[in-house]
């Protein structure tokens, strides 16, 4: 029985689609997927809160306190962005 061109085209398209999906799953199982954040890193970030080394005393206004915290966080980011903190 002779197949039409459209049936052959659909067959090859489906085959390519299935192979590409299978190859992406295999690559992810081998460790080529982006790393997942560890729970300890997430816990440290969530429990850190306002304890970032900047203390706002009662004499500081809310705006001054926010500026101090922003500068401290930015400085921390600058000096730690090249570090590999993953365990």
Swiss-Prot record:
<feature type="propeptide">
    <location>
        <begin position="25"/>
        <end position="76"/>
    </location>
</feature>
<keyword id="KW-0964">Secreted</keyword>
<feature type="propeptide">
    <location>
        <begin position="82"/>
        <end position="87"/>
    </location>
</feature>
<feature type="region of interest" description="Disordered">
    <location>
        <begin position="31"/>
        <end position="59"/>
    </location>
</feature>
<dbReference type="GO" id="GO:0030154">
    <property type="term" value="P:cell differentiation"/>
</dbReference>
<keyword id="KW-0221">Differentiation</keyword>
<feature type="modified residue" description="Sulfotyrosine">
    <location>
        <position position="77"/>
    </location>
</feature>
<keyword id="KW-0217">Developmental protein</keyword>
<feature type="compositionally biased region" description="Basic and acidic residues">
    <location>
        <begin position="41"/>
        <end position="59"/>
    </location>
</feature>
<dbReference type="Pfam" id="PF06404">
    <property type="entry name" value="PSK"/>
</dbReference>
<keyword id="KW-0339">Growth factor</keyword>
<dbReference type="InterPro" id="IPR009438">
    <property type="entry name" value="Phytosulfokine"/>
</dbReference>
<protein>
    <recommendedName>
        <fullName>Phytosulfokines 1</fullName>
    </recommendedName>
</protein>
<feature type="signal peptide">
    <location>
        <begin position="1"/>
        <end position="24"/>
    </location>
</feature>
<comment type="function">
    <text>Promotes plant cell differentiation, organogenesis and somatic embryogenesis as well as cell proliferation.</text>
</comment>
<dbReference type="GO" id="GO:0031012">
    <property type="term" value="C:extracellular matrix"/>
</dbReference>
<feature type="modified residue" description="Sulfotyrosine">
    <location>
        <position position="79"/>
    </location>
</feature>
<comment type="similarity">
    <text>Belongs to the phytosulfokine family.</text>
</comment>
<keyword id="KW-0765">Sulfation</keyword>
<dbReference type="GO" id="GO:0005576">
    <property type="term" value="C:extracellular region"/>
</dbReference>
<keyword id="KW-0732">Signal</keyword>
<dbReference type="GO" id="GO:0008083">
    <property type="term" value="F:growth factor activity"/>
</dbReference>
<dbReference type="GO" id="GO:0008283">
    <property type="term" value="P:cell population proliferation"/>
</dbReference>
């Amino acid at each position: 029985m002779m197949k039409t061109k459209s049936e052959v085209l659909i067959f090859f398209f489906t085959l390519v689609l299935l192979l590409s999906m299978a190859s992406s799953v295999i690559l992810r199982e081998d460790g080529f997927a982006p790393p997942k954040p560890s729970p300890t890193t997430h816990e440290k970030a969530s429990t850190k809160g306002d304890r970032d080394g900047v203390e706002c005393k009662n004499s500081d206004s809310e705006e001054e306190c926010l500026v101090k915290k922003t500068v401290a966080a930015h400085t921390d980011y600058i000096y730690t962005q090249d570090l590999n903190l993953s365990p």
